[in-house]
Design a protein with these regions (language model features):
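Conserved S-adenosyl-L-methionine
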Residues: 170-257, 261
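Non-catalytic, mostly N-terminal accessory regions of nucleic-acid modification and defense proteins
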Residues: 1-192, 251-253, 257
Length: 263
């Protein structure tokens, strides 16, 4: 049974996950841990939702389909959110293993997306703290029915801004004031079928704004080629997650990379 999550509930849920880290992690590093866990939770909840829909529609025949015919992202057996949640010792190791397995199972889309946070450093992230984080995120089901893409994307953007506000001078590498971004988007006036390129895309705010602009205009946005370039690997991963959470899934249209020269 679905239970819609309001924007207010979502924002509180997301920010309270960061509050759990405050005594152990510097504010500038929140994004290394909260964003990957949020994305992993979303992937697994949507995976379960897609499985249930396939069984409802096809019954026993659902097992005849290849996983990629049913699922947006594949979650390998034994590496689902619930499997990680069940671990009581060496939780950081279990998280890293699940991240790598999911990345490898979706290598054309997700390679490197979970970053390289120090999950196994028990001085910074003891098992107790990681268990608390997992239990906190487990209090809500982040299915599409409960939290549509645009709304979860809005929550993600809220968290990006909160992290930027908390981390001060370190924020400029991944966050641009959204008022400026929206003004630039209106000046750009993107159209359906065009290519949109941001050479310093950060967390992909400009690219997301361009897609949102087309949606608000009632124009087709799925045929827009979106390109971004970002030299910082962590920020690039945040940008990829941002695009995915906003419903931009076709990675043949998305190129967030870290080259030293323009695309």
């Amino acid at each position: 049974m679905s239970k819609r999550i309001t924007i207010e509930e979502l924002q509180s849920y997301l920010w309270n996950s960061a509050v759990l880290l405050r005594t152990n992690i510097d504010a500038g590093a929140y994004k290394q841990y909260i964003f990957p866990l949020l994305f992993f939770k979303r992937i697994c909840d949507v995976y379960d939702e897609e499985t249930a829909k396939a069984v409802e529609e096809y019954g026993d025949d659902a097992s005849e389909f290849d996983e990629d015919e049913i699922h947006t992202f594949i979650v390998p057996k034994g590496y689902h959110w619930n499997d990680v949640r069940a671990v009581s010792e060496n939780v950081g190791v279990a998280i890293v293993e699940a991240f790598r397995k999911v990345e490898n199972a979706n290598s054309d889309k997700l390679q490197g997306i979970f970053g390289d946070g120090a999950w196994t450093n028990k001085n910074r992230l003891p098992d107790r703290l990681l268990k608390d984080l997992l239990e906190h995120f487990s209090t809500k089901t982040l299915s599409i029915a409960n939290c549509p893409e645009d709304e979860l994307g809005q929550g993600y953007e809220y968290l990006i801004k909160k992290f930027a506000d908390d981390s001060g001078h370190t924020a400029q590498e991944f966050y641009t004031n959204r008022t400026v971004v929206h003004l630039m988007t209106e000046m750009l006036n993107p159209e359906s079928g065009e290519s949109i390129y941001d050479p310093t895309c950060g967390s992909a705010g400009m690219l997301i704004s361009a897609i949102a602009y087309l949606k608000e205009q009632g124009k087709e946005w799925r045929n827009v080629a979106v390109y971004g370039q970002e030299i910082n690997a962590l920020t690039s991963a945040i940008g990829k997650m941002n695009l995915f959470l906003h419903g931009v899934k076709d990675l043949s249209l998305i190129h967030i990379s870290e080259p030293t020269r323009p695309l």
